[in-house]
Amino acid sequence: IYMDNKSTVEDVYNTIRSKKVHQIPITAFGKKIIGIVNKKVILNLLMNDIENAQEILKRKIEDIYLPEILTAEPESDVRKVVQIMLDLKLDAIPIVDENDVLMGIVSKTDILKAVSHLPKLQLWS
């Protein structure tokens, strides 16, 4: 799931809610990732200018501040990706190719599901 930078703030918020995701990558020029937005970013934007909330919802998502994002490549060491997610308290990291074109997103849930399928660990004391 991703949204184009020409989407409205309202469309992005509604997609986050309807798809039950925590955040959504924003792309431009095809699928080149330019940012990532979550509900908190949108709600803070609305709360900081409550009198103009309806106007803000109609704005294009590219017109609001998109925080810098960390990305990973498909070949990235999953342990390093997990460590970065833990250190920076990230819920997910977008996966991009060498041209920053969005290929997917890896979330904490994805990692936990993958780990749950590993063989059981044997602990010795």
Residue ranges, per PLM feature:
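The conserved cystathionine-beta-synthase
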Residues: 2-21, 27-28, 71-89, 96, ...
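A generic helix-loop boundary/linker signal
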Residues: 2, 32, 54-55
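A glycine-centered beta-loop-beta connector
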Residues: 16-19, 24-41, 85, 93-110
